[in-house]
């Protein structure tokens, strides 16, 4: 699994011009699933995301977690994180998980985030979405469970 985490001051996602999810301070997560990902990948990511200390404390140091600042998460499915651009000019997405599998894993990822005590808003898997966000920092972090092992 791959997750691009962006620290935001606000974010929202629209589908068919209707707001599907919105948050204030927190994270936007772009979530990509590959075939072969498993619950251990989800557990690793949720633990890292939940405990990550990238919000500033009173001294201005990145020392507070999303839970410490009562932040929320906007989770967006993003198969294009697995784009292969080695050949030609049109990316290939064959490394992305099959939609049936990726949907289950994406939903399980969000459920596990919620079970950890975090507020999670989502887009809709496979939908054409318009995501708006205001980066805070900016702070952007890439997680890849295959390179973490």
UniProtKB/Swiss-Prot annotation:
Its EC number is 3.1.1.96. Gene3D superfamilies: D-tyrosyl-tRNA(Tyr) deacylase (3.50.80.10). GO terms for molecular function: D-tyrosyl-tRNA(Tyr) deacylase activity; Gly-tRNA(Ala) deacylase activity; Ser(Gly)-tRNA(Ala) hydrolase activity; tRNA binding. A motif (Gly-cisPro motif, important for rejection of L-amino acids) lies at residues 137-138. It is found in: Cytoplasm. An aminoacyl-tRNA editing enzyme that deacylates mischarged D-aminoacyl-tRNAs. Also deacylates mischarged glycyl-tRNA(Ala), protecting cells against glycine mischarging by AlaRS. Acts via tRNA-based rather than protein-based catalysis; rejects L-amino acids rather than detecting D-amino acids in the active site. By recycling D-aminoacyl-tRNA to D-amino acids and free tRNA molecules, this enzyme counteracts the toxicity associated with the formation of D-aminoacyl-tRNA entities in vivo and helps enforce protein L-homochirality. Belongs to the DTD family. NCBIfam families: D-aminoacyl-tRNA deacylase. This is D-aminoacyl-tRNA deacylase. It comes from Leuconostoc mesenteroides subsp. mesenteroides (strain ATCC 8293 / DSM 20343 / BCRC 11652 / CCM 1803 / JCM 6124 / NCDO 523 / NBRC 100496 / NCIMB 8023 / NCTC 12954 / NRRL B-1118 / 37Y). The gene is dtd.
